[in-house]
Amino acid sequence: MKIKNKKFIIEFIGNSQLKKFLNNSKGRLKKLSEYFQPLHLNEKQTSITIKIVSNDEIKSLNKEFRKKNKVTDVLSFSDEIASGDIAIADSYILNKNNTINSQSFFMLVSHGLLHLFGYSHYDRQSRSNMRFLENMFMKFIGLKPVHED
């Protein structure tokens, strides 16, 4: 499934479970597009791929690109021109009954997009800014904020 606006095109890659979840989340995906459009400052339209991956795959990516040999929740990769990729570990978004948790899914998507659009959390101020934007996004799409104020 793809979502598109003047600033970016996002393609989601995953199994049939993800496709079903995305079809049931069209309203939130539309709001995702609305929320992130003004935060994306690149003049060119950006192509973004968001892929749900296994723990083994994200661990391998984390080791290769960040030199950390451990599983993580989300990784973002930008080529600085007009595209980017986000990998999300399935273990961080699946409920015990193996369905996708909306809260976790949209939080990690927002976190990855903020990184692609130039935001970071390397110090207290940047972490506070990022958490604020993540909380505002979650409220905007009708979900609970994930960070305490």
Task: Pin down the residues of each PLM region.
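An acidic/histidine-cluster motif and surrounding catalytic segment
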Residues: 1-108, 114-149
